[in-house]
Amino acid sequence: MAKLRIIPLGGLGEVGKNMTAFEFGDDIVVVDCGSIFPRADMLGIDLVIPDITYLERNRERVRAYLITHGHEDHIGATPYVLPRVPAPVYGTKLTCALIRGKLAEHNIGNIQFHIVKPKDVVEVGAFSVQFIKVSHSIAGAVAMAITCPAGTVIVTGDFKIDYTPIDGEVTDLNTLAAWGSRGVLAMLAESTNVERPGYTMSEKKIGETFHNLFKDAKGRIIIAMFASNLHRIQQVVDNCIEFGRKICFVGRSMVNVTKLAMEIGELKIPQDVFIDVGDLDCYEDDEIVVLTTGSQGEPMSGLTRMANSEHRKLQIRQGDTVIISATPIPGNEIMVSRIIDQLYRCGANVIYNRIADVHVSGHACQEELKLMHTLVKPKYFIPVHGEYRMLHRHAHLAQELGMPEDNVIILEMGQALELSEDEANITGPIPNGSVMVDGLGVGDVGNVVLRDRKHLSQDGLIIVVVGVSRETGLVTSGPELISRGFVYVRENEELISGARNVAMNVLQRYDRIEQSDWTSVKNGINDEVHNYLFDLIKRNPMILPIIMET
């Protein structure tokens, strides 16, 4: 019998960039298509997406993209992947709407969408897929039961078990248990919160905290959160109605997502409660709530611009209550701390998660993960969606529940897993890695470019310009030194003059400089100017010699 191949293209050893291909016979379906924030050392990079070389090589066999929910780490790569490997997209109403919006921003059309609801079953090639309702920090999140002749795989997606969700739709434990009773070949379950004991707090708790903060606030209330957290936004709106406040949205993603959510009925805001940011001056401070982006301290976000007095319409001032309803994504802690400090400097009363319950996670903690394992009862378990220590801890948790060690498989990027009822084998290698997006360029920035950017950012640049006669090969001008990001020339004229003399000494070794000599001349200038500067001030600027024919 043919085997099912599970091919992770992202989401292993990292929190984000989630993408997994499932292959049986001639058919491939892809679960999720996410991006991840660039690391601090990825200078100038806007976004990081999965390497889809394997999908491009097999593009005629890719039948569908199955999307668990609409967070960026699950849909952020769609504008870059779908044009290169097109296939129909399956997702819930909000998920498809968010992807359509992203594609429209990139002027991408001709992608077929299929809107599904929980419990729907779709047939895609050799696969039958059932979508299963789960609770998460965004509406429309689903798990999936993916069935092929080799067996059924449960993909949990991001989930938690919230018994009091805002929309009243709890994680469908009955359907998950029913699949467990039938027999599940394997389960891929998220590992984000596996290090946390107990249960994740209910989203309803945030509404109670908001109620108390609204009751006590005397001035404007400004709340920063992720635009995709519509259940939390709805709780803010409900408190605005109760306390007679108006609400406005600030930040491109906040405006776009809330507008889209209202259009499809996922967010309900009475017309007389919603106002435009330009109308804020028409209301007293205690009548205003501003919902904005910037919970991660992003430099160009709405909250950061308000705190730094760079926003055209809004500045933080004495008497404002600012609520940061999120926890920092790993790597963003310093930026968030800086923005909190700046908010205090502006005179605001700042509320964040260390002070009050203004954020809860959307991911399952240990006891919820144990319940998922107990209900699904998979033969094989593959932890996903987490850094390596999280995958390891999740594997250990599965073994504590009685799963044989040989049936718990921690995959690495570049590996594939071949599964049948009788055996599981790790194969590979599969092309894998990260593709960096810089502006409109996708994949044209690699490690060499990043190394140069890092070099420039740390030590600056010196350009050495030399003019050489095309006819005689004699030096006609220069060497002229131009410094950028290295030293302030007017205050370091002696240093720059010395470097110029070093470059001149290199040129004087040549009676004539023919084109065949250019490489050796440039290398000589680079090496000797570098050594001169390092000996004097122990710094390593990038040296860029330029020879111009005159």
Where is each model-derived feature located?
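Broad gene-expression machinery/nucleic-acid interaction feature
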Residues: 126, 141-143, 459-463, 543-545
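C-terminal tails and terminal domains of large nucleic-acid-associated
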Residues: 514-550
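Hard-cation-handling environments
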Residues: 195-325, 329-498, 502-514, 522
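Short Gly/Ser/Thr- and Asp/Glu-enriched loop/turn motifs at secondary-structure junctions
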Residues: 117, 412, 539-543
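His/Asp/Glu-rich metal-coordinating catalytic cores
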Residues: 1-66, 71-283, 301-315, 334-338
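A glycine- and charged-residue-rich anion-binding loop/surface
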Residues: 12, 36-40, 61-62, 352-355, ...
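Conserved hydrophobic residues forming the short capping helix/wall of the S-adenosyl-L-methionine
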Residues: 103, 398, 533
